[in-house]
Regions:
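Hydrophobic core
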Residues: 13-19
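N-terminal targeting leaders
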Residues: 2-7, 19-174
Length: 174
């Protein structure tokens, strides 16, 4: 009887870290989903902004580029209010004001989202192809359904007059 009790106790002690690990994984996954939800729901988050984040324990690091300084501070404030977040490291870059960059943004938006094959992405609430323009240099961020869409967006962006370079960071969903 004593041997059986010791064995049950030993099994319980061995199983406890696995239960705690699954609970912490569930908590981490909940935190990741909540951070994503709060960032996507920001009122002025649009196709010309790119927000990303990293969760390390209870610390959230915000990354990306935005066109408005208020969006940078709003992102930090909504993430700070999430239950379980202890600190926020805001590394979001505010893009410089430039009439030429604004003109390029509109021309790129029109070219990419009116292109047959890519026009279906324009119908989504938050279009998945984000167009980041900094001093004439373009970065395409986000997700597309196929490698062909990724290449088509790259060729289209390169064809817009006034673009100095295009960095294609689009990820193909699998």
């Amino acid at each position: 009887m004593r041997y059986l009790t010791h064995r049950i106790l030993l099994l319980a002690l061995l199983a406890a870290p696995m239960c705690l690990a699954s609970q912490s994984d569930a908590g981490r996954n909940r935190l990741i989903r909540q951070v994503r939800h709060e960032l996507v729901m920001l009122p002025y988050y649009g196709v010309f902004d790119n927000l990303a984040y990293k969760v390390d324990g209870y610390k959230v690091t915000l990354l990306g580029q935005v066109t408005r300084p208020t969006l940078k501070s709003a992102a930090e404030n909504v993430v700070k209010d999430i239950e379980g977040v202890e600190s926020v490291d805001n590394q979001i870059v505010v893009l410089p004001l430039s009439p030429n960059d604004d003109r390029l943004r509109m021309a790129l938006y029109r070219a990419i989202y009116s292109r047959p094959g890519l026009d279906r992405y324009a119908l989504m609430a938050v279009p998945p192809i984000h167009i980041i323009v900094a001093n004439g240099n373009v970065s395409l961020e986000g997700y597309v359904a196929s490698e062909m869409d990724k290449n088509l967006a790259n060729v289209t962006a390169n064809g817009v007059s006034g673009v100095f370079s295009v960095t294609n960071n689009l990820v193909v969903e699998k």
